[in-house]
């Protein structure tokens, strides 16, 4: 869970994500049309926050960073798991206590009764991706300010809550799958793909604004276009098929790092491998396998349960030897036996995945998995989690040790008095490892440099910049 911050002067986040607004600073602005905004949850929710803020800034509202400076606070909530629900409710309560005027939106907004039971004094509640409804509620409770309509109050790319050099590109909304542990479809609906021309227009604007890395996100990236039967769209006057491969081809021609998230292991992924092997798309796949036991995958109702996953991974690595695979897994799912768990550990040994996250199963209100028999005890969940992480740390450490002495490109994220911190193609922001370059204080965020790896641990690399290498600022 991250909580992002909006700086109205530079439309970027702080380097360490924090809450948008703080409670202890006195108001220094005139009153009337000032919005405080707190964005909780995943990158897809962050994109929704960017869209709402862009519309409000276009209409002349100011966005401020403290509770005291705000005339009204919007909280964009997360409701994916129970801990996220509690964080959302706590944040709403904090905003009410410090400001008093709060509009709630986002995934938890579909549970209006639950919110009002805890916080009856919120001004309004909307569900996820209800952009116009949120703005209309702001109009109702905070009159639209007078402003010069000919003055451009936002950049061409809109308000962005990420650093200037990378941006999330959401290509669709919703999901057609019905995994038993997940309630996303009940909150965000079935798959709805954005028009491909609209996506490519946005990507081009981001490129023109200096963005170096596009992080392609959705609930199911590999299903992009399925809902519209991959119909033909248009971009720059030319026909373009609405599909993941065609989208990746066009994005890869723009000269940015293109990183794919939330991909399912369908056969269609094979078609993207040549783009990764040729350097048009980063050789990085974020694929949530979730488990390796066929029986548990069936209980989860995972769409790829019947796929020959290991065969696909081997084929992908043959087509693109540099491929980095990130995945997430659940341990302690209802009915998981020691035999099932051992299948998962064996899969880690066989698959040799580069980046892995693991979660202990917990019930989520409204999820069908709650009703499955044979729950796993908390003690067993913890024990399996520790065994899983120990296994994966050994794999990750060995893989990173083999990179010592190699030359890599590094996208710089942060520079301080000790040096620079960046990421390689193998590292997505916030969730993967980092590359440390000690002493390189003259670099800037957004620079792309060449470096030689000198040291590694289980997750991160230490490198030195290659002399006389070109910077891409």
Swiss-Prot record:
Identify the EC number(s): 2.8.4.4
Residue limits of the TRAM domain?
A: 401-467
| Residue ranges occupied by any Radical SAM core domain in the UniProt entry | 161-399
Q: Extract the InterPro entries matched here.
A: Elp3/MiaA/NifB-like_rSAM (IPR006638), Methylthiotransferase (IPR005839), Methylthiotransferase_CS (IPR020612), Methylthiotransferase_N (IPR013848), Methylthiotransferase_N_sf (IPR038135), NA-bd_OB-fold (IPR012340), Ribosomal_uS12_MeSTrfase_RimO (IPR005840), rSAM (IPR007197)
Reaction(s) this enzyme catalyzes, per UniProt: L-aspartate(89)-[ribosomal protein uS12]-hydrogen + (sulfur carrier)-SH + AH2 + 2 S-adenosyl-L-methionine = 3-methylsulfanyl-L-aspartate(89)-[ribosomal protein uS12]-hydrogen + (sulfur carrier)-H + 5'-deoxyadenosine + L-methionine + A + S-adenosyl-L-homocysteine + 2 H(+)
Gene Ontology CC entries for this record: cytosol
What GO biological process term is on the record, naming one?
tRNA modification
Q: Which residues form the MTTase N-terminal domain?
A: 33-143
Top EC class per UniProt?
A: transferase
Summarize where [4Fe-4S] cluster 2 binds, as residue positions: 175, 179, 182
Principal place of residence: cytoplasm
Its job: Catalyzes the methylthiolation of an aspartic acid residue of ribosomal protein uS12.
User: What protein does this entry describe?
Assistant: Ribosomal protein uS12 methylthiotransferase RimO
Q: What is the lineage of its organism?
A: Bacteria, Pseudomonadati, Pseudomonadota, Gammaproteobacteria, Alteromonadales
The protein's required cofactor(s) are namely: [4Fe-4S] cluster
């Amino acid at each position: 869970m991250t909580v992002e911050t909006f700086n109205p002067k530079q439309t970027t986040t702080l380097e360490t994500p924090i809450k948008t607004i703080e409670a202890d600073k006195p108001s220094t602005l005139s009153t009337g049309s000032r919005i405080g905004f707190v964005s909780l949850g995943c990158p897809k929710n962050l994109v929704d926050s960017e869209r709402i803020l862009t519309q409000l800034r276009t209409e002349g509202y100011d966005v401020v960073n403290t509770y005291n400076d705000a005339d009204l606070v919007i909280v964009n909530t997360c409701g994916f798991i129970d801990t996220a629900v509690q964080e959302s409710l706590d944040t709403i309560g904090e905003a009410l206590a410090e400001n008093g005027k709060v509009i709630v939106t986002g995934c938890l907004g579909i549970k209006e009764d639950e919110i009002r039971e805890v916080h009856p004094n919120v001004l309004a509640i909307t569900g996820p991706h209800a952009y116009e409804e949120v703005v209309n509620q702001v109009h109702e409770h905070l009159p639209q300010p007078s402003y010069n309509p000919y003055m451009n109050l936002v950049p061409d790319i809109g308000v962005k809550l990420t650093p200037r050099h990378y941006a999330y590109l959401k290509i669709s909304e919703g999901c057609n799958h019905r995994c038993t542990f997940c309630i996303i479809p009940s909150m965000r609906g079935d798959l709805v793909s954005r028009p491909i021309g609209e996506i490519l227009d946005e990507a081009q604007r981001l490129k023109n604004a200096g963005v170096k890395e596009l992080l392609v996100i959705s609930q199911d990236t590999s299903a992009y276009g399925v809902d519209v039967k991959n119909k033909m769209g248009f971009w720059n006057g030319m026909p373009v098929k609405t599909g993941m491969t065609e989208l990746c081809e066009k994005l890869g021609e723009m000269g940015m790092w293109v990183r794919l998230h939330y991909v399912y292991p369908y056969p269609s992924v094979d078609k993207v491998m040549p783009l990764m092997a040729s350097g048009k798309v980063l050789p990085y796949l974020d694929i949530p396998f979730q488990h390796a036991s066929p029986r548990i995958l069936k209980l989860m109702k995972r769409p790829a349960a019947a796929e020959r996953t290991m065969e696909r991974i081997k084929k992908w690595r043959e087509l693109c030897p540099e491929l980095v695979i990130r995945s997430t897994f659940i341990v302690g799912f209802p009915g998981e036996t020691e035999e099932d768990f051992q299948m998962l550990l064996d899969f880690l040994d066989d698959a040799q995945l580069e980046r892995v996250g693991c979660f202990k199963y917990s019930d989520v209100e409204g999820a069908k998995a709650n009703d499955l028999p044979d729950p796993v005890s908390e003690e067993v969940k913890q024990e399996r989690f520790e065994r899983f992480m120990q296994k994966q740390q050994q794999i990750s450490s060995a893989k990173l040790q083999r990179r010592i002495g190699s030359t890599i490109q590094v996208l710089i994220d942060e520079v301080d008095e000790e040096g620079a911190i960046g990421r390689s193609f193998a590292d997505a922001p916030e969730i993967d490892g980092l590359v440390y370059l000690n002493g390189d204080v003259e670099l800037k965020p957004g620079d792309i440099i060449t470096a030689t790896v000198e040291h590694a641990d289980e997750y991160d690399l230490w490198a030195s910049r290659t002399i006389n290498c070109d910077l891409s600022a």
